[in-house]
Curated annotation (Swiss-Prot):
Cofactor binding note from Swiss-Prot or TrEMBL: Binds 1 Ca(2+) ion.
Annotated site residue numbers, Putative interfacial binding surface (IBS): 2-3, 7, 10, 17, 22-23, 60, 103
Cell compartments where the protein resides: Secreted
Family: Belongs to the phospholipase A2 family. Group II subfamily. D49 sub-subfamily.
Cofactor: Ca(2+)
GO cellular component terms, semicolon-separated: extracellular region
Role description: Heterodimer CA-CB: Crotoxin is a potent presynaptic neurotoxin that possesses phospholipase A2 (PLA2) activity and exerts a lethal action by blocking neuromuscular transmission. It consists of a non-covalent association of a basic and weakly toxic PLA2 subunit (CBa2, CBb, CBc, or CBd), with a small acidic, non-enzymatic and non-toxic subunit (CA1, CA2, CA3 or CA4). The complex acts by binding to a specific 48-kDa protein (R48) receptor located on presynaptic membranes, forming a transient ternary complex CA-CB-R48, followed by dissociation of the CA-CB complex and release of the CA subunit. Monomer CBd: The basic subunit of crotoxin is a snake venom phospholipase A2 (PLA2) that exhibits weak neurotoxicity (10-fold less than the heterodimer) and very strong anticoagulant effects by binding to factor Xa (F10) and inhibiting the prothrombinase activity. In addition, it shows the same effects described for the heterodimer and binds the nucleotide-binding domain (NBD1) of CFTR chloride channels and increases the channel current. PLA2 catalyzes the calcium-dependent hydrolysis of the 2-acyl groups in 3-sn-phosphoglycerides.
Assembly with partners or alone: Heterodimer of one of the acidic (CA1, CA2, CA3 or CA4) and one of the basic (CBa1, CBa2, CBb, CBc or CBd) subunits; non-covalently linked. The acidic subunit is non-toxic, without enzymatic activity and comprises 3 peptides that are cross-linked by 5 disulfide bridges. The basic subunit is toxic, has phospholipase A2 activity and is composed of a single chain.
Protein name: Phospholipase A2 crotoxin basic subunit CBd
C-alpha cells in the first residue's frame, strides 16, 4: 500500500516520500522512462520492475503486514500478493537509505520531458 511504503521510506531515510521521492528523477513516482539518473532513481526503477512482476496483484492499494523494529523492516504473513508487495517496498526503502549520500536535490522535481533515450529493461 502506498501509505505503508511511505512509512518504510520515512523509517529508512528520515525523509517523507512527498516531496523527496514522489517526483525524483525519471522513475520515482508514477511511471518512468529513459535511463535512471542516479542510484536513488535506480532504486525506483528496480521497485517499478518488482511491481511489474506482480501484474495480478493490486500493488498500490493492497494492505500488508509489516513491522518497523530495531532498525529493520520485517514483512509479515499474508496472501502471496501481500508478501511480495511488502518485499518490493522493503527492498526499495532500504535501497533509498543506501543511496542517501548521492541524493541530488536537482532531481527532486525532475521533469519527465528530460527523461529521454531508450528505457532500460528489467
Amino acid at each position: 500500500h502506498l501509505l505503508q511504503f511511505n512509512k518504510m521510506i520515512k523509517f529508512e531515510t528520515r525523509k517523507n516520500a512527498i516531496p523527496f521521492y514522489a517526483f525524483y528523477g525519471c522513475y520515482c513516482g508514477w511511471g518512468g522512462r529513459g535511463r535512471p539518473k542516479d542510484a536513488t532513481d535506480r532504486c525506483c526503477f528496480v521497485h517499478d520492475c518488482c511491481y511489474g512482476k506482480l501484474a495480478k496483484c493490486n500493488t498500490k492499494w493492497d494492505i500488508y503486514r509489516y513491522s518497523l523494529k530495531s532498525g529493520y523492516i520485517t514483512c509479515g504473513k499474508g496472501t502471496w500478493c501481500e508478501e511480495q508487495i511488502c518485499e518490493c517496498d522493503r527492498v526499495a526503502a532500504e535501497c533509498l537509505r543506501r543511496s542517501l549520500s548521492t541524493y541530488k536535490y536537482g532531481y527532486m522535481f525532475y521533469p519527465d520531458s528530460r527523461c529521454r533515450g531508450p528505457s532500460e529493461t528489467c
